[in-house]
Amino acid sequence: MTWLVGLLLMLGLWIAPAPAHAAADGAALFEAHCVGCHLNGGNIIRRGKTLKLKALERNGIQGPLEIAMIATEGRGQMSGYGEVLGEDGADAVAEWIWQQAQNDWHNGST
């Protein structure tokens, strides 16, 4: 009987949804590497290139994939931060940025 309980616990952990730490990691990465130029989703260098939803869409960015590519490789005056953000960092920060843009940056920590 004990083995059955153990098996059920392991099965429950295996099929449980992934923890929501990607957003937390994205927020931490944003705070550490992006907020200097993009405080509250703005842009202190180029005012029209903010991280607000309207500006993202106007600049052809339709989701986190494009944001991750820009974070990794850079675009225009923005340098790429792929090495700084690490293997999954660009995806995590891009997901977080996209969530904030969807909420008009009202729920962000910055």
Residues covered by each model-derived region:
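Bacterial N-terminal signal peptides
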Residues: 2-14
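Electrostatic cytochrome c docking/interface patches
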Residues: 13-29, 63-66
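Gly/Gly-Pro-rich "capping" loops immediately C-terminal to redox-active cysteine motifs
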Residues: 27, 39-69
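Flexible coil segments in periplasmic/lumen-exposed cytochrome c-class electron-transfer proteins
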Residues: 28-32, 80-110
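Short pre-active-site segment immediately N-terminal to redox-active cysteine/selenocysteine motifs
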Residues: 30-36, 41, 74-77, 89
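Detector for the c-type heme attachment site
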Residues: 37-43, 83, 98
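A short secondary-structure junction motif
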Residues: 41-44, 74, 100, 104
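Periplasmic c-type cytochrome electron-transfer domains
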Residues: 65-80, 97
